[in-house]
Amino acid sequence: MTQKNKMSTYTKGMEIRRQVLGNKHVENAIKNTNKIDEKFQKFITEGAWGSVWSGDQLTKRDRSLITISLLAALGHHEELEMHFNASKNTGATYSEIAETLMHVAVYAGVPASNSAFKILKKVFQESK
């Protein structure tokens, strides 16, 4: 891959990252980046946002619900809360997220889904 293609993947990744997570979150991530995680931040911007999230086969809403289900199933609560907040930018509704968490309960276990529901209720209350 040429440097030009890498830059366009990074640029596209930053654009989508901002659309989904919001400028404030992305600016905080950039501000807090240092030599320890600089390579990692570039990796997630190009890999996750510039490649996976930029695909044209799924909507941002679909990707949001998939991401939420995986984060809930794996117990990644900090990222889960961030993506619950980001769902406002992807078009995923709280009722769709709740339905997604029902699938998590069946396929990943009730405790994983129960923890996710607690976080969702907190985020929902804070957004009122």
Which residues are covered by each model-predicted region?
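Mid-chain, well-packed structural core segment of small domains
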Residues: 65-68, 72-98
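Acidic, glycine/proline-rich low-complexity segments that act as flexible tails and inter-domain linkers
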Residues: 1-61, 89, 115-128
